[in-house]
């Protein structure tokens, strides 16, 4: 029994998401934040229920600032990616950074957490990962204002985190 061993939380880490391009390694799925039906037929609700029945809390890994080129999000919103035009793209861990200077991207990233929390109110913790530095420095949104990209990116991230904290003040998050 997990609780008898001193376990107080079950954290579902990387690999639980995406259906068109299911996450099986670091080459696909980032950006498509729905449970992989073939891996989790009961979705996240079945896991939160099992955790509750075991007397432990439930946490979830996400990396919402990133996207794999092999994802539905990238196919639909390539213009949301920080990427130099007319240059060969550099991939760090087969992923790219979403442009959080763009309010549409901020809404999307907030929506990832909001949807997961709405559908799974028993989530008490997010491990918010960020496994790539910003490379390919160019924002389609900033256009002529490229010199402010880093600053506007961080401001955008803070706006997202402020919105999450305002709606879910008891939700714990570790940003790493």
Positions of PLM-derived features:
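Aromatic-lined carbohydrate-binding/catalytic grooves of carbohydrate-active enzymes
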Residues: 1-111, 120, 124-125, 142
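Short, loop-centered acidic/histidine patches that primarily coordinate divalent metals
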Residues: 15, 131, 176
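Conserved N-terminal glycine/acidic-rich loop preference
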Residues: 84-90, 94-95, 101-105, 113-116, ...
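Aromatic-lined carbohydrate-recognition surfaces of secreted/lumenal glycan-active proteins
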Residues: 11, 54-69, 154-176
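Active-site-proximal structural scaffolding
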Residues: 3, 40, 44, 51, ...
